[in-house]
Amino acid sequence: MAAAGSLERSFVELSGAERERPRHFREFTVCDIGTASAAFGTVKYSESAGGFYYVESGKLFSITRNRFIHWKTSGDTLELVEESLDLNLLNNAVRLKFQNYNILPGGVHVSETQNHVIILILTNQTVHRLILPHPSRMYRSELVTESQMQSIFTDIGKVDFRDPCNSQLIPSVPGLSPGSTTSAAWLSSDGEALFALPSASGGIFVLKLPPYDVPGIASVVELKQSSVMQRLLTGWMPTAIRGDHGPSDRALSLAVHCVEHDAFIFALCQDHKLRMWSYKDQMCLMVADMLEYVPVNKDLRLTAGTGHKLRLAYSPSMGLYLGIYMHAPKRGQFCVFQLVSTENNRYSLDHISSLFTSQETLVDFALTSTDIWALWHDAENQTIVKYINFEHNVAGQWNPVFMQPLPEEEIVIRDDQDPREMYLRSLFTPGHFINAALCKALQIFCRGTERNLDLSWNELKKEITLAVENELQGSVTEYEFSQDEFRTLQQEFWCKFYACVLQYQEALSHPLALHLNPVTNMVCLLKKGYLSFLVPSSLVDHLYLLPDEHLLTEDETTISDDADVARDVLCLIKCLRMIGESVTMDMAVLMETSCYNLQSPEKAAEHILEDLITIDVENVMEDICSKLQEIRNPVHAIGLLIREMDYETEVEMEKGFDPAQPLNVRMNLSQLYGSSTAGYIVCRGVYKIASTRFLICRDLLILQQLLTRLGDAVILGAGQLFQAQQDLLHRTAPLLLSYYLIKWASQCLATDVPVDTLESNLQHLSVLELTDSGALMANKLVSSPQTIMELFFQEVARKQIISHLFSQPKAPLSQTGLNWPEMITAVTGYLLQLLWPSNPGCLFLECLMGNCQYVQLQDYIQLLHPWCQVNVGSCRFMLGRCYLVTGEVQKALECFCQAASEVGKEEFLDRLIRSEDGEIVSTPKLQYYDKVLRLLDVVGLPELVIQLATSAITEAGDDWKSQATLRTCIFKHHLDLGHNSQAYEALTQIPDSSRQLDCLRQLVVVLCERSQLQDLVEFPYVNLHNEVVGIIESRARAVDLMTHNYYELLYAFHIYRHNYRKAGTVMFEYGMRLGREVRTLRGLEKQGNCYLAAINCLRLIRPEYAWIVQPASGAVSDRPGASPKRNHDGECTAAPTNRQIEILELEDLEKEYSLARIRLTLARHDPSVIAIAGSSSAKEMSALLVQAGLFDTAISLCQTFTLPLTPVFEGLAFKCIKLQFGGEAAQGEAWSWLATNQLSSVITTKESSATDEAWRLLSTYLERYKVQNNLYHHCVINKLLSHGVPLPNWLINSYKKVDAAELLRLYLNYDLLEEAVDLVSEYVDAVLGKGHQYFGIEFPLSATAPMVWLPYSSIDQLLQALGENSANSHNIILSQKILDKLEDYQQKVDKATRDLLYRRDL
């Protein structure tokens, strides 16, 4: 059908009705501007409508591209709407109510200037001028990037409707025709607003408003013949002068054509004559009798014209055309003329064509320089639209427009169907009913109950359901009735509501006018309740829908260059039409049901054929067989028809705009047909094509079944029969199913998607790296009544199609004009190509997935899967995503696995596995598995991740990197699930040592955090023992000691493996760190336990092996992550190059344990020292213990570590001093530390004080801990004397007994001369035998006893000290006392010496 381009095809009506909330009109009242004639106030006019197109609406880069205004008038109300096919206009609908005035039919005229859009309005008493901004002046930039913009009506509220400059009463001048409804208005070249009205005498009244920005007053002029000569020249004389009884010459229809500084006013009058006036010259330039062009005009000449209409069309190249409709009873005639000008300002009409029609009531017609479009409304309330090319159509054959029929009057409901569900499905099926009809029916059905009718599609459905159910229940009088009775009652009320809606739908579908844009050739039908668009039919649809009489006269050469082929196709179409007309409703439902239930269409067709043959009472099948015999080559004809309907293509459409195009061009093109209206129209066009083609394919299947039945009759040979059965039949069925699927998609509503669901979906798609695929919506909620096809067109397909259309323009884009029939045909064709199931791309499915339409996607794939083997893997993948969302995870996994087999064969899957940098790192299947695993991970399905990764391992084969990745993945998710054994097993199978070590580290950390230490310890760690020890050690040294128990874990690890020495080493290191880093009581407690555990470990080893290596300083200070050590200048200190190894034996550990216990004792007694006790040495601890009064503990510590007890005694002596001179507070505090030291006996007398107890404790220690040189006595006395404390007698006596000479020296050191004198005296007496036992002298001086001695040096020092102050008499006495004692001593010594010598001599 290559020659089909020259065919004048039929058009199809596509409703552009709003399905969402009713259009929101902003209402304004135009108040009464003065007193006018009361006679006009009662005039009622019929509803009318009209439209205006912008001059540059067809330019590709114009701000007014695809933009137009349409309006409707009804009584005193004018509704104005601005539409755009590219953008959603805001505030684009206004309703003006004219107080006390009615708007004339056709009394709205719109003009545009460079800066303004000016609306001129005529009512029965006034004229008005509305001045609005031009779209080109509303935006600073020509490049509009938003998807919506403000309408020119946005600021109409600022207009002063009573401004006398723009509103004027029509003066009550004589001769103004009171009953006339025609009018005209225009803008002069000077900006004046001119309004033309017919006069009763046949002239024209013109009311002029000065330019809006120039002061002035309104004026009125009447155009009439001013001289008899002019009347004779023009052949016109007013009726009153003629005096005959012929028809009046009052104008029935006015039209204006502006030329430079003049305006021609054309008036088609009741006397069937056309008059042309010059406004500038105020004279009639031409009169033409239209009856001259009417074949039978005798009756018309005597009667006044009533339904004549006049239209103008101007072409810069061809001039001005006039279209005249001459109305006559039961017939009508169109005459087309061209205005011809001659010299001397004389004009004539050149008759171009006369076209006849049998339709009676012409509602409106539109004229272009080539075509006439006509709108009729017949007696059966049917709307009829036709068009004709008046230049080339010699036969006068009108081309039909297939109007959108009203929904079925009755809905057939089977017994197994719910009436409410079926009626709601019909009421809310996209394209069936408009929102306004549903709202009006709801209002009536509720008997005027106040209801909020500003409802969304879903809200309206709920309200209707509630209203009908309430009405039903209100009518029930009986409490009990059968289910059948209830069903009958339910069906009755739903049928009643449905009939009400149907009635309003019919009323709102009443046609009012045609709106034709000659720039773009777009034709719209303005109806009472909505707007519809007329689009051309495809060749196949045109032939199938064409009435029989048109099909018979169809030019065969336009179908094919081969006349025989063309005749065969026409005969085939005729046969299909005959089958289609014979198919009953039940048969049609059978085929639809078979497609929906995934049953064989061929079998359904065979069943329908059998039913057709069975019920064929009018011998239709015989007629079809007879008609088939006229087809010379049925196989070729059927193949030609199938090819024409098949949109399968091997080449995928380009994605995105050509980057070589400038940004402003790409941005501008990206908005073409971007409005919701355009999207709806395009998708309705696709639905119309799919519906028609579905019927064609259905009838074709039935016909092929018939051909099969006929067998090798005269029609087909055996070879052809086989071909028809095997080839054509199997090609037709997928075609039918494809169109069924597209038809289903065009009626399947998209669902609302919450923002959080969209965000979650976006996260999943970002994991798959599909967020830039173009199949995603721009973060907005899906409109409730939007179909999934509209969603796809708006979000994805539109940009693809537009970029494809303008990728290789035939002319520069700036010069490209938009032709609506061509564009809508191309756009619907490419959209069908993108939707075609067997084409390689699957953008439609991807769009549904990207926009969270999961239920619809599942249904679509279910309808597609059994018969379409294209994109199988992509479908399985997307179905898997749907199952993920619905929670059917095993089904999802199964789908993902099935899709893997198609990787590398399908475009979507190839794009899915393509990495961002384009680098192929593994096989395609492994890349696919990686993406799916990441998706499952993000969704949070570890079980599925494990299963899929396990399956993918087989695919990995010898690829050790992929093996490592997959096994790591398995390990990770087993670990997350708490499958510790499986996680360890997976860990051991990772071939990459680096990954294995990372996983091992993770295993250790996670099991520690979960406190699942038994598993961690008991795993065998074959070939991983050192690694796990190293990991635990590094973790132990890197983390906080009190919140993590890695040391204890490592201890258990070694104990479990009987490695006691390492276990002891671990616990010893743990204890060391606790002391240094954990300055708490709990830390000290743990430190003791650690050392005790280390001791136990060494005791389990044979003595010769019971040792450990002192943990190096690096175990504590050089840990990973520790900050570098610096000197006082801030520079890093160099690490020591060599370290000495220190061996610790059991004894050393016992000492450390003892020290740890002592630390704990001290900490419990005095918490303030906790911070320093933990890391203190034994010597430091001794001082701390003494300071705290824990003298028993201090002595024990000193003995353990072989430390001198001197600090202990000094400390106790000091405390005694403090108590000696302290107050009550000191006494009270002393009891606490005294209680911690065990005294030899308890003194229970009340007289005993803390001071006494302290001295007694000191005395006890001195008696208990004796040393060879009496060091402790010395240090205690020294301490006391240094603080000026008198020595207690017991201490003096105690020290005298052990070292009186040292006591003397101490007295001398502290200048205690009198005490020294007393001591010397007593000492000399003791030596001489008087009280010798108090000085520890066993044998006093005698000849038989051992030798005795006196500390002469100290005595000499004493005498010297006493003699230094000779003025002190007391000193002299003391000195003399000593000298006397010494003299006495010397005498006795001398005597004893002699006795000794005597004895020796014997």
Swiss-Prot record:
GO molecular function: structural constituent of nuclear pore
Pfam families in the cross-refs: Beta-prop_Nup120_160 (PF11715), NUP160_helical (PF23345), TPR_NUP160_120_M (PF23354), TPR_Nup160_C (PF23347)
Entry annotated with the keyword Hydrolase: no
Keywords: mRNA transport, Nuclear pore complex, Nucleus, Phosphoprotein, Protein transport, Translocation, Transport
InterPro entries hit by this protein: Nucleoporin_Nup160 (IPR021717), NUP160_helical (IPR056547), TPR_NUP160_C (IPR056536), TPR_NUP160_M (IPR056535)
Positions of modified residues (Phosphoserine): S10, S456, S915, S1123
GO CC, alphabetical: nuclear envelope; nuclear pore; nuclear pore outer ring
Subcellular location: Nucleus, Nuclear pore complex
GO terms of biological process kind: mRNA export from nucleus; nucleocytoplasmic transport; protein transport
Entry keyword Protein transport: yes
Function: Functions as a component of the nuclear pore complex (NPC). Involved in poly(A)+ RNA transport.
Subunit structure: Part of the nuclear pore complex (NPC). Forms part of the NUP160 subcomplex in the nuclear pore which is composed of NUP160, NUP133, NUP107 and NUP96. This complex plays a role in RNA export and in tethering NUP98 and NUP153 to the nucleus.
Protein name per the record: Nuclear pore complex protein Nup160
Encoding gene, per UniProt annotation: Nup160
